[in-house]
Structures are given as structure tokens and as C-alpha cells.
Amino acid sequence: MASGEDRISALPEDILHQVLRLLPAHEVVRTCLLARRWRGVWRSVPTLCFTGAKGWGSADRFAQFVDHLLHLRCGGDGAPLDSCDFDFDSDGFMLLPANERHASIWLWKALPRVRALRLCIVEEQEASPLSDMHLFSQHLTRLELVGVGINNSVVDFAGCPTLVELSMDTCDVFVRQLLSPSLKHLRITRSYTSEFDRILISLPNLVSLEFIECRQGRIPFLGSLPRLARAVVVLNEYCADQCSQDRFDSCGADSDICDGCYYYYGDPGHGPHYDRNNCIFLKGLSEATDLELSAHSDVTVFNRDLKWCPTFTKLKTLLLNDWCLAANHNALICFLQHSPILEKLTLELSKGPLYETEAEGIYKPLGQSIASNCLKIVEIKCANVDSKVHKILEILTTYGIRLEQISVQQTSRIPGSGCFNFVCTEFS
């Protein structure tokens, strides 16, 4: 500026806070050297973001800085904190056990003061473990963990009565129970779970659930979720709930032949054991209004649950992929007959022939009636209108759905032209 006037320093403090919250913590602290006006601004910025030891010369110097700053900000006289972010992504800091202990201590220091806490430790190694997940905070509302190893037998967030959102991405989640009386939103993505035991999820106030493309292990066992409104579940080829004998019911083989069935209801040698005459997963989703259930063709858990399929009394929108076409489309028929107020059904079909299996379906259709008189539209999204689509149209019309209610979206009609959509009027 020609006049040399410092207009930035003249801004209100809340505006300065909005600018500084975009910077890592060490750069925020350095602003105290800019001018007299800036000397104390860093002390009241409502966010802290630590970006790892890179550039500090040594991990010890970085650790000393974090220790001192957390002492100043999280002590009794520190200004309130909206959020604290520890981002150690790919800087190597967590490779040393001593630094893992530092991270656990910092988490405990920040926890009582913040409303949102994020810990990110993504490196080319196993997830870094947290020494203790028995957390206590009267203020924490959101917790995000990335690349963290959780090995407690029970993770109980009763000590965080205001926690409403928990997100875990690329984590090792080797726990038997996940409990919280307050949690409303749970997201577990690309994580590792046990191949021998399921996570019992007991969250009476849960509103939304996302369990997406976990890299190992079994789908959780869902307790009662009376407030659940929406769930998105994507099970890929790494899900351990598969039968090596291609059966939807248990093949009865021992662990040398089929781990998928042998450990389906828990480790017979150690437990816990789940009720063999009840759902593992679908019953916990029965209160939802919006469901997306996608699975690799080898995954059996959804089809096994159909034997005890609950009635989805509130379900209005449903998305399924190819897994529902196995065993004479029994899963598709089952959902149609157990969703009395369903308004919209979406079927996302992959390329390739109709999924065939020698296994007999567990669910036996209830005649040829369809439960929902509320159904407005069925959307079929496919690469090509082939025999698979024709078979689905035949099934849908057999169970009372009119062709004019069905919309087919063909995604590969002309390369680069996007989606081709049409409403069915006839098929042969």
C-alpha cells in the first residue's frame, strides 16, 4: 500500500480468527511477530491444526511445541476451542513408539476443551494404535479418526454425553462392542475389522449409518436402532462373510474349508455367539426410511438374513445392486413384500450376465402379491439393456408393478454421451 497503512490489523478480531483458522498452528503462533495488534490474537483462535513434524528439524522439537501450545490453550485459562486437528499424514512422525505415546497424551489434553477432534495418521504402515479409547469430555460433539488402530474390547462413549458424530476411515477397528447413548451419525469406511468376531453396535440414538468398502473382516452385528433414518452399506470382495461352497445358508464346513461359515456366528472357541435364528444385520436397519445396500456377488450376509427378514415399516427409498438378483431374484422380491410404504426402488446393475448360483434361496416368496401400494417409480441403472434387465422386468410385472412405473437408465448407449433414459411401455 502506498500509504503504508495496515488495514488488515484494523479488522475485527472475529474476522482475523476466520483467516487464522485456515493456517497450521505453528504459522498462527508466528503472527504474534507481525505487529503489536497481533501479539495475543493467536491465543484466542478457535481452532488448532497440527500438521506433523516435517520441517521442524526433529520430532522432539515438534513434540515440545505441541506440548507447550496445548498447555497454554487447554489449561484452565485458555480460550474455548471449536476444533483441534492432528494431521500426521505421511510425515513419518508416528513410526516411533515414543511419538505414539505423545499423540495419545495430546489427545487427552485437547479432549476436554474441544467440540470437534480429528486425528489423522495415514502412512505406508499398519494403523497407529491409540493406547486408550475410554474418552471423557462434556463438550466433544464430533470425533474423526483416520489411520488409527483401535484394539479395545469395548469402546464405550458414555463418557462423552454430547458426542453425536463418529467417523473412522482406514482404521483398524478390532473391537467387540461399540456403545454410545448419544451418537447420531456413524461412518466406517475402508477400515479393517476382525475376521472372527463381529462388532456389536449398540447406538439407541443413531440416525445415520455408513459402512463402506471395508478392507477386511465381517459386517457388524446391529443391535436395536430405533431412530435410524438412513443407512448406506457397501460390501466389497474383502468382506469375510462369504461361503467357499457358494451357499447362502451355512455349508457346515470347518475352518480349514470355509472360514466364512465357521466363524459366521462368532469364534466357536471363544465367542461371542450370536443367535442362529435371527438376523445379523438387516433387523437393525428395519426402522430406516432410506436404505442403500450394495454387495459383491460372493458376499452372503444379506441373503442369509432374508430368512428372518423384518418388515421395513418406514422404508420409502431403497437402492440395491446385483446381489439381490441371485436365487431367482428372491432378495428383490423379499424387499418388495416387506416394504409396505416403499415409494422408490433403484437397481444398479453391473456389466455382465445375470448372476447365477447353484445355491437355493433362503427366502420363500409370499405368493405373487406386492406389499406396497405407494410405489411410484422403479429406476434400473444399467450399462446395457440385456437379458438381465428383461428378466428383472418380468419379475417386477409378475409382482404387480406396471411398466409405466419403471424407468431404465442406460449408461453406455453412446460413449461420452452420458445417460440414456426411457420409460418402459413393453418388453418381449
Q: Where do the protein language model's features map onto the residues?
A:
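Non-core capping and flanking segments associated with repeat-based/extracellular domains
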Residues: 1-428
